[in-house]
Amino acid sequence: MIFMEVTLAIVKPDGVKRGLIGEILKRYENKGLRLKAAKVVTPSIELLEKHYEEHKGKPFFKPLIEYMSSGPVFAMVLEGENAVKLVRMINGATKVEDALPGTIRGDFASSTTYNVVHGSDSVESAKREIALWFPELIL
């Protein structure tokens, strides 16, 4: 079944620093996703703690927050058929050793932390994350 969805994707600081925004956006658009909203921002620790709240207390939480707040990110809302699943497929596996060539992470990630991109993991997460990153956007 086909569902028109919106999802949040983020080019993380390592991807922005390496000039990968255009290549990543092209990969999403080539699969039929449309850019609905986008911004370059250096996220606050407060925003990131809300975004990653399900990981609070895990050993990687603090390093993840520090990394994600270390520089600008390119946050975007993408729209399309089965957008959540499609973005995750294009991104590739979270763990760099599991990411296949041809995926964003398979081609560009240097570690599981420095894995270039974020994509919402469910429709519910997408709604919550978009509300955090784009509070001005009415969906």
Swiss-Prot record:
Origin: domain of life: Bacteria
Annotated catalysed reactions: a 2'-deoxyribonucleoside 5'-diphosphate + ATP = a 2'-deoxyribonucleoside 5'-triphosphate + ADP; a ribonucleoside 5'-diphosphate + ATP = a ribonucleoside 5'-triphosphate + ADP
Subcellular location: Cytoplasm
Segment forming the signal sequence: none
Single Gene Ontology BP annotation: CTP biosynthetic process
Active site location: 118 (pros-phosphohistidine intermediate)
InterPro entries given in the database record: NDK-like_dom (IPR034907), NDK-like_dom_sf (IPR036850), Nucleoside_diP_kinase (IPR001564), Nucleoside_diP_kinase_AS (IPR023005)
NCBIfam families: PRK00668.1 (NF001908)
Keyword NADP: no
Name this polypeptide is given: Nucleoside diphosphate kinase
Function of the protein: Major role in the synthesis of nucleoside triphosphates other than ATP. The ATP gamma phosphate is transferred to the NDP beta phosphate via a ping-pong mechanism, using a phosphorylated active-site intermediate.
Protein's gene: ndk
Binding site for ATP: 12, 60, 88, 94, 105, 115
Listed cofactors: Mg(2+)
Family: Belongs to the NDK family.
EC numbers: 2.7.4.6
Keyword line: ATP-binding, Cytoplasm, Kinase, Magnesium, Metal-binding, Nucleotide metabolism, Nucleotide-binding, Phosphoprotein, Transferase
Organism, scientific name: Caldanaerobacter subterraneus subsp. tengcongensis (strain DSM 15242 / JCM 11007 / NBRC 100824 / MB4)
Molecular-function GO terms, alphabetical: ATP binding; metal ion binding; nucleoside diphosphate kinase activity
Assembly mode: Homotetramer.
Entry's Gene Ontology cellular component terms: cytoplasm
SMART domains for the chain: NDK (SM00562)
